[in-house]
Amino acid sequence: MVQSYEDMLKAAYSGIGEPTETGERFVMPKAKIYIEGKTTVLENFSDIVDSLNRDKDHFMKFILGELGTAGKIDGNRAVFNGKFEQAQFDAILETYVGDYVICSECGRPDTKLVKDDRVLMLLCEACGSKRPIRKRKAKTEVQGPAIEEGKELEVHIESISKKGDGVARIGKYILYVAGTKAGQNVKVRITRISGQVAFTQKIL
């Protein structure tokens, strides 16, 4: 049975912490960031890449696309132009793991990226399943309603954060909605905006 994208995300996040083939548990790496002048530094970039077992250039390109900025790899860290929030990196990391690391069939991280007739696929070395990588639009191409504090709007919950809040996206903004589930459409009120992160209150 073909799973919906929401079901795939649920399988990805429920699979985090499950034993790998070696018997070790996969632990979602935590981004360690700090502001340095007009830039944001991801201090443990190399550690995250090693933990995910992915190519550093592929991971870096993904982050740059999600943040809509420029940056560079500097030794074991990565530097991004602009000031960004911890919540943004947490959401980006969760999205990357769901799309490019966790098997949607067995929920394990024992996977690798392969090309099959020019199509990028995620091949699971644990259960043997293979699926195409979901194409994502660059954030600069995504348009949405204007975001401002106090505004009410309807959003689609794409995934669930590590803290249990629903994650939605409107244009360049990441919205957190407490008390929701992946796949839901809910009406919310914007309570606070910090950079490209918006905090909301669900309207009952």
Swiss-Prot record:
PROSITE patterns: TRAM. SUPFAM superfamilies: Nucleic acid-binding proteins, Translation initiation factor 2 beta, aIF2beta, N-terminal domain, Zinc-binding domain of translation initiation factor 2 beta. Keywords: Initiation factor, Protein biosynthesis. GO terms for molecular function: translation initiation factor activity. Residues 146-204 form the TRAM domain. The keyword Ribonucleoprotein does not apply. Pfam families: eIF-5_eIF-2B (PF01873), TRAM (PF01938). Signal peptide: none annotated. InterPro entries: IF2/IF5, NA-bd_OB-fold, TIF2_bsu_arc, TRAM_dom, Transl_init_fac_IF2/IF5_dom, Transl_init_fac_IF2/IF5_N, Transl_init_fac_IF2/IF5_Zn-bd. Heterotrimer composed of an alpha, a beta and a gamma chain. Belongs to the eIF-2-beta/eIF-5 family. eIF-2 functions in the early steps of protein synthesis by forming a ternary complex with GTP and initiator tRNA. NCBIfam families: aIF-2beta, PRK03988.1, PRK12336.1. This is Translation initiation factor 2 subunit beta. It comes from Methanocorpusculum labreanum (strain ATCC 43576 / DSM 4855 / Z).
